[in-house]
């Protein structure tokens, strides 16, 4: 029907697929989002996440690494430097717990006309989401209920296990789709110290890819060895024993043009109080 006005239908189809631009509430403070003032280490980390690159926060449990990462992600979304968030964790259980926290976080920063709920991506995600979703149209063939395994990372916001992102750098079907879904997003990789050598090697490749895709990579860990830190940053780092520790490298040296030495920066907080 060439005479038909397809514009409203196209917008509806794109909206149904979850690809409409985000509508954020701007100017929200850390206190408004989380109900308390940021600690010194949290504020220092938030201040340093200024654009695409790799940012590592090493701090003990209970220091609020998750809140710091989420607020840094909010700042990137607010400034138009990111198009979404993927929060990667080592297990299905931790993914389920963080999914609830990210869901509450998004309900505060997004306007009503934006996609509100983050997808949960892991092998048994349906066990958690089945009771939360009204099936409706999503249960029809071709709708997200059947496609989430292939295109889950295309959603603006998702929480899941690290393997969902690792498949972007492994020779598997739809790896290019997964890489495309991560491009330009804030990718938060939590509990990085918990991965074995095999998984850690693939994570190194993933971080390299994410830098090339102009992602903002936030790595959270209790502690990292010097060699692991250097592998993520792609730059030699002097030995430091300070703790907590914030390490960062931006993506400027990865842009096309004459090759330049990658610049890295460190911020040290000498007290955990």
Model-predicted segments: where are they?
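N-terminal helicase ATP-binding lobe
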Residues: 1-273
